[in-house]
Amino acid sequence: MVREDVVGSTRTLQWKCVESRVDSKRLYYGRFVLSPLMKGQADTIGIAIRRALLGEIEGTCITRATSENVLHEYSTIAGIEESVHEILLNLKDIVLRSNLYGVRNASICVRGPKYITAQDIISPPSVEIVDTTQHIANLTEPINLCIELQIKRDRGYRMKSTNDSHDGSYPIDIVSMPVRNANHSIHSYGNGNEKQEILFIEIWTNGSLTPKEALYEASRNLIDLLIPFLHAEEEDMNFKENENRWNLPPFSFQDKFTNFKKNKKGIPLTCIFIDQSELSSRTYNCLKRSNIHTLLDLLSHSQEDLMKMEYFRTEDVKQILSTVQKHFAINLLNKKL
């Protein structure tokens, strides 16, 4: 456990972690302070940060399980203590850590008698199991059990579709909520017109990320949501100047796509994710909100497609041009192959 004393200050606004502890593999706690704030500011920031922590942070979870010879979700399998439904619930609770997007495949292949835990999940290197002791099922007989799993990074909670079960394949409720709880409190100090506030933020996470990482991501997401208002004002004040900046040479990623596929060796385009490049967080989040996760997704869009995206700017297109040319050796503005 780490603790620091909190002292009111009249200096520049600053934040720090005053308490940090790990209660278990799936329960991290952090306490942070931001000060000095003017009266009313602490509540404004505290409410926004708490909502972002609980609703805007992304997480990785198991979204589907497939196994042969399973009649329906509420059936039982001879030699297994739990029903299929109970196994699915246990899989839903498995805490995973991954920074990559797209669907990842994993599996469980064991022979009983055996007590199956998260340690028995065979997952790709990009996916880390936070707590390998989490219970999945108990095989009481010498039987084989093989389960194919799908893993996905997402945000929030979404109930499975009851119409999406077929041939032993069952969807699992998406619970991508790394932050288990978040609170904020306010401490006032000073007198009269000099009254100031200290904002305390408490964060509990499931171990897939630390409270500090959660606070950083929530803050970044809030900033990204507010940036369009700033640019809207700039564009209104400098309309003529901005008109000139809209004239980028037209291009299409598709112009180079065929040639790039022929010459590129090794990693498939579907395995090159945009978070592996050096895009700014603003540009990255704009692409992500439009379901552009891989280089293949990006190469399927033209300049016009990108400019139709919400909050997307000419500067973002320029940055994508530069990044793709730098990292993937594609000269998008050159007409000749």
Swiss-Prot record:
InterPro entries: DNA-dir_RNA_pol_insert (IPR011262), DNA-dir_RNA_pol_RpoA/D/Rpb3 (IPR011263), DNA-dir_RpoA (IPR011773), RBP11-like (IPR036603), RNAP_asu_C (IPR011260), RNApol_insert_sf (IPR036643)
Gene3D superfamilies with a match to the protein in the record: 5' to 3' exonuclease, C-terminal subdomain (1.10.150.20), DNA-directed RNA polymerase, insert domain (2.170.120.12), RNA polymerase, RBP11-like subunit (3.30.1360.10)
UniProt region (Alpha N-terminal domain (alpha-NTD)), positions on chain: 1-233
Stretch list, region Alpha C-terminal domain (alpha-CTD): 265-337
GO CC list: chloroplast; DNA-directed RNA polymerase complex; mitochondrion
Keyword Transferase part of the UniProt annotation: yes
Reaction equation(s) it catalyzes: RNA(n) + a ribonucleoside 5'-triphosphate = RNA(n+1) + diphosphate
EC number: 2.7.7.6
UniProt superkingdom: Eukaryota
Keywords (A to Z) from UniProt: Chloroplast, DNA-directed RNA polymerase, Nucleotidyltransferase, Plastid, Transcription, Transferase
Entry keyword Nucleotide-binding: no
SMART domains on file: RPOLD (SM00662)
Main subcellular location: plastid
UniProt free text on domains: The N-terminal domain is essential for RNAP assembly and basal transcription, whereas the C-terminal domain is involved in interaction with transcriptional regulators and with upstream promoter elements.
Family the UniProt entry places it in: Belongs to the RNA polymerase alpha chain family.
Subunit record text: In plastids the minimal PEP RNA polymerase catalytic core is composed of four subunits: alpha, beta, beta', and beta''. When a (nuclear-encoded) sigma factor is associated with the core the holoenzyme is formed, which can initiate transcription.
Function: DNA-dependent RNA polymerase catalyzes the transcription of DNA into RNA using the four ribonucleoside triphosphates as substrates.
Protein name, UniProt field: DNA-directed RNA polymerase subunit alpha
Gene for this chain: rpoA
